[in-house]
Curated annotation (Swiss-Prot):
The lineage of its organism: Bacteria, Bacillati, Cyanobacteriota, Cyanophyceae, Synechococcales. Binds 1 [4Fe-4S] cluster per subunit. This is 3-isopropylmalate dehydratase large subunit. It comes from Parasynechococcus marenigrum (strain WH8102). It catalyses: (2R,3S)-3-isopropylmalate = (2S)-2-isopropylmalate. It comes from the Bacteria.
Length: 472
């Protein structure tokens, strides 16, 4: 195996051909599809008389459009029903495994592939979804792609790509109590900007990253795209192997031993040269909340919305736009900003550990008057495990709604939407204008524990000020 960074090694292993203009045709080890970006791609295959090249490397689920209050068929939304029915037909026609509702394996695409053991170190992973970078947590190189590229991967199991530069995000020390991987990535994006990673793959490294669980690493890599990076990854280690061991899609027996031996060699070499490196001190990071209309407009919980003159000239136009849209004034403390809706879920923070963290806040407390709060597990497996631990009861006793798995209020493609000028505390990944369903709705991004704290107080609250109880 060639030396260098993990990105270099995985790239070299998957090169099919060098193309005119300097791009490379890469083999795709795992192609994940869902109901939103695949219909046009399958239609293009039919028009050209093509079949799916590697159905055994293609895995489907339904997530974006599914309702979370009742998933009985047919859906009340006829368009959503049509999209799911189309996915079912396309998968049946091409021999693709569909992890459908009620299968025990359905959920958000970036939740189910890891929990099923399908995402593994050294893979290239593609999906018609921006947050495919999630899978880099395993030491994979994972890209979000557009519908035309979904078509190309279905037809050829390969993808034309230009090689990225590598920036190491070195995080020294350890995160303080009450500070999560979500806070870390929001802090990184705040520091480097939403365009700071353009042209880069982010290698997350250092003691603070190594101390994260796999689910926390997934949160970190999930939002690399929000910082402009095409992908983000963590070098595989024993934490990775322990997570994968025994999962349905992982090797077993002697094949497992061989796989682990090979996976260990994928990690970036100690003397690997990267194109850039940025160092962070984990201990200096506080619970972080966005105040504006991009994920880069974040603040530590003890900070105030910045005055215009405190910002770099290039940041001022978007800040002025954010002041108007969010109706938040410069100098306002982010702690204490009132909220209307609290959402815990998404491919960023809808896993079991996320629900445990939020439940530790909710236990023995109650949602504040007038607040709508709900929890949407990231998958059927997450829901089952959470219910086995009694987390559903913890949330319901506290006044949260316990919903069925799906993307939910992360985006406005299902019935879970903000109304009017409502402001949400959300554990999702994007706070763009109108992202959560209302053209004038407002979103504050934060960790699941911080969302739970906001729910019980009716306003943005420093979770570190609350005594936490085990939710199990």
């Amino acid at each position: 195996m060639s030396s260098g960074t993990l990105y270099d090694k995985v790239w070299d292993l998957h090169r099919v051909a060098e193309l005119p203009g300097g791009s490379t045709q890469l083999f795709v080890g795992l192609h994940l599809i869902h109901e939103v970006t695949s219909p046009q791609a399958f239609a293009a295959l039919r028009d050209k008389g093509l079949s799916v090249r590697c159905p055994e490397r293609t895995v489907a689920t339904v997530d974006h459009i599914v309702p979370t209050t009742s998933q009985s068929r047919p859906f009340a939304d006829s368009l959503a029903e049509e999209m799911l029915s189309t996915l079912e037909r396309n998968c049946a026609d091409h021999g693709i495994t569909l992890n459908g509702i009620g299968s025990g394996r359905q959920g958000i695409v970036h939740v189910i592939a890891p929990e099923l053991g399908l995402t593994q170190p050294g893979m290239t992973v593609a999906c018609g979804d921006s947050h495919t970078s999630t899978h880099g947590a395993f030491g994979a190189i994972a890209f979000g792609i557009g519908t035309s590229q979904v078509r190309d991967v279905l037809a050829s199991q390969s993808l034309a790509m230009s090689k990225l530069k590598v920036r190491r995000i070195q995080v020294n020390g350890r995160l303080s109590d009450g500070v999560s991987a979500k806070d870390l990535i929001l802090h990184v994006i705040r520091t480097l900007g939403v365009k700071g990673g353009v042209g880069f793959a982010y290698e997350f490294a250092g003691p603070a990253v190594e101390a994260l669980s796999m689910e926390e690493r997934m949160t970190l890599c999930n939002m690399a795209i929000e910082g402009g990076a095409r992908c983000g990854y963590v070098n595989p280690d024993q934490v990775t192997f322990d997570y994968l061991s025994g999962r349905a899609g992982a090797p077993s027996g002697a094949a497992w031993d061989r796989a682990v031996s090979w996976w260990r060699g994928l990690a970036s070499d100690p003397d690997a040269v990267v194109d850039d490196e940025v160092v962070f001190d984990a201990a200096s990071i506080a619970p972080t909340v966005t105040w504006g209309i991009t994920p880069g407009q974040g603040l530590g919980i003890d900070e105030c919305i910045p005055q215009l003159e405190q910002l770099e000239p290039g940041e001022r136009p978007i800040a002025e736009e954010a002041y108007r849209y969010m109706d938040l004034q410069p100098g306002t403390a982010i702690a204490g900003v009132p909220v209307d809706v609290c959402f815990i879920g998404s491919c960023t923070n809808g896993r079991l550990s996320d629900l445990r963290a939020a439940a530790a806040v909710a236990r023995g407390r109650h949602v504040a008057d007038g607040i709508k709060a709900f929890v949407v597990p990231g998958s059927e497996q997450v829901a089952k495990a959470a219910e086995a631990e009694g987390l559903d009861r913890v949330f319901q006793d506290a006044g949260f709604e316990w919903r069925e798995p799906g993307c939910s209020m992360c985006l406005a493609m299902n019935p879970d939407r903000l109304e009017g000028r409502q402001i949400s505390a959300s554990s999702s990944n994007r706070n763009f204008k109108g992202r959560q369903g209302s053209a004038s709705g407002r979103t504050l991004l934060m960790s699941p524990a911080m969302v739970a704290a906001a729910a019980v107080h009716g306003q943005v609250t420093d979770v570190r000020t609350l005594s936490l109880q085990s939710a199990v």
